[in-house]
Amino acid sequence: MTAAQVAELASQAEAVPDAGIYQMYQNRSWLWGQNGAGFFAVQRRQFSAWTSDKGKLGYGDGIWFLPGGGKLCFRAKWHGAGGDADALTCFEHRQAGRVVYQRKIPDGDWYVFRSSDRNMADEFMKVKYGDYATWKQNRIKAKP
């Protein structure tokens, strides 16, 4: 399926309700391969993450929230070799049947986030129950 076809299907799909977004992310970590992970805690909607860009480690602390319209956002203060920066990152989710589409807002390309058959290649398979971010984040914070 081409990117244009995925975009067309996503445009016809419905926004995922807030309850559905919450179920997908609550107390789960989104694993970013070797490049980091972000944890979406239920308690105080805390967001904790670590990243690695070209071998340079960094971390982020903040909150995550659901502004409606199928959106998930996290606002964090990021700390790294290049200094500190505040950032707001949002993703939009749309659903048609059991298929969920996702894109980074404002202008990311749509892709299949979760297939109807839960394909192992789906990005959703990288969203795991539990905290896979805080331990690494704490190790990064502890380095002089």
Cite the ranges covered by each PLM segment.
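Lipid interaction determinants
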Residues: 1-61, 67-144
